[in-house]
Amino acid sequence: MTHVILFPAIDLKEGRCVRLVQGDMAQAIVFSDDPAAQAATFAAQGFSWLHVVDLDGAFAGAPMNAAAVDAILAAVAIPVQLGGGIREMRTVEGWLGKGVSRVIIGTAAVRDPAFVREAARRFPGKIAVGIDAKDGKVAVEGWAKTSTVTADELGRRFEDAGVAAIIYTDIARDGVLKGLNIPMTLALAQAVSIPVIASGGLASIADIHRLLEPDCALLAGAITGRALYDGRIDPREALAAIRRAEQARGAGA
């Protein structure tokens, strides 16, 4: 059984903390003008990791919210994984040098697999691949375009690359609170040996309990965004459920 991690999401647009609906920048809902304060709140609530995305960077292909990310890194001691606009080695080096614990490579994983392999070789345990899918096909450039590559195909390309994790997002469910796409996420987790983190659609504590069912043992965790901001998920309740499940498994081992 993989240790399950629940990642609170901070999506950055123009320096603010927002949530999108199915990746549509025109449907950005602002939840906080102070991402660093939001990060500190998540850390105080007991979360062990943060998931941060530079949305403007994902569209631009280069970091666009550096000041906000810097402020988040200064505000918390827990590890931060960061994605959005990471398409060059100097960007990887820059963020890791500033204290980001893990960088997520998305578009470049489709366009330039050798870049991912080289980054994983140079920075073991620090590189994740973001696989964002629409109808099973991988989307790129801030989800603005869809490739011909399937999620399973892309995951298998990095099977022996030393990638630390895959973050799998079902775009159709992202920000609409329809529940995680467990079947598709599990299919990917079964196709690769890389730890897979589920994203997109997590809506309630029921989704957390579903994640903790025995058939989801391959999954390494999930990312929660809108449900957390909307108050649909109580952080203490969610984290306590994960602790109880892991204690029960430990007792039964």
From Swiss-Prot:
Residue ranges of coiled coil: none
Pfam families with a match to the protein in the record: His_biosynth (PF00977)
Keyword Isomerase included in the entry's annotation: yes
Any one GO MF annotation of this record: 1-(5-phosphoribosyl)-5-[(5-phosphoribosylamino)methylideneamino]imidazole-4-carboxamide isomerase activity
A GO CC term assigned to this protein in UniProt: cytoplasm
Subcellular compartments: Cytoplasm
Catalytic activity: 1-(5-phospho-beta-D-ribosyl)-5-[(5-phospho-beta-D-ribosylamino)methylideneamino]imidazole-4-carboxamide = 5-[(5-phospho-1-deoxy-D-ribulos-1-ylimino)methylamino]-1-(5-phospho-beta-D-ribosyl)imidazole-4-carboxamide
Alphabetic keyword roster: Amino-acid biosynthesis, Cytoplasm, Histidine biosynthesis, Isomerase
EC number assigned by the record: 5.3.1.16
Top-level taxon in the UniProt lineage: Bacteria
One GO BP annotation of this record: L-tryptophan biosynthetic process
The protein's annotated pathway: Amino-acid biosynthesis; L-histidine biosynthesis; L-histidine from 5-phospho-alpha-D-ribose 1-diphosphate: step 4/9
Major location category of this protein: cytoplasm
Active site residues per record: D11 (proton acceptor), D132 (proton donor)
UniProt-listed CDD domains: HisA
InterPro entries in alphabetical order: Aldolase_TIM, His_biosynth, HisA_bact_arch, Isoase_HisA-like, Isoase_HisA-like_bact, RibuloseP-bd_barrel
HAMAP family: HisA
Family as reported in the entry's similarity comment: Belongs to the HisA/HisF family.
Name of the protein in question: 1-(5-phosphoribosyl)-5-[(5-phosphoribosylamino)methylideneamino] imidazole-4-carboxamide isomerase
Gene that produces this protein: hisA
